[in-house]
Amino acid sequence: MNDQIELYGANTGNTLRAAIALEEAGIAYSPRWLDLHAREQLDPAYLTLNPAGKVPTLIDHGMTPALVINQSNAIIHYAEAKAPGRLAPAQPGPERIRVIDRYFFFVTDVIAPSHAAFFLHQAGQDKAAAIIDLRVIEQLTYAESFLTDDFMAGQQFSMADISAFTIVTAFRDRLDWKQLPQLSRWFDTVESRPSIQRARAAFQNR
């Protein structure tokens, strides 16, 4: 626990991405769980930190003024910058570029469309949402081809695996795992990492 760095969140994929990044980077933090069903994310005090009323939000009180980050992917970059070499190769070169390329594949081609499908479902546009969901599953299936090494971007766990893990978790019951042996092997390996277990435990529903 570290009160200098606080992470506000809930049991969501976005929060999990941020928490895993901090855990993998070895950055001590204090989790601050918000009950979304009780609409704690709309409390006036929290809205001063995150006017959109969403999670996660990271506060680094070690900076003057305190640094506030509201985007999970920005928190991943924050963690990578504070702990060079932990979430991506520290030195410029092909290995680092591959990590960034795979990371953004999951952010832009998989996670972003899945969010669009979620909002379409909420708006009652189920047919349109289903089309996008199928596209997400196709892209996750395509990721099988990435796994020529242990992880999504090589032999080292990286930010690419963080973005991949949370979205694969969300779609795990809709994937044909028998057709995805490498993705299945990768998922089991990543899910068993202590950082994943700690990040999940930090924001489980209470």
Q: Where would I find each of the regions flagged by the language model?
A:
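Residues at alpha-helix termini
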Residues: 25, 49, 174-175, 194
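GST-like domain detector, emphasizing the conserved glutathione-binding G-site
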Residues: 1-130
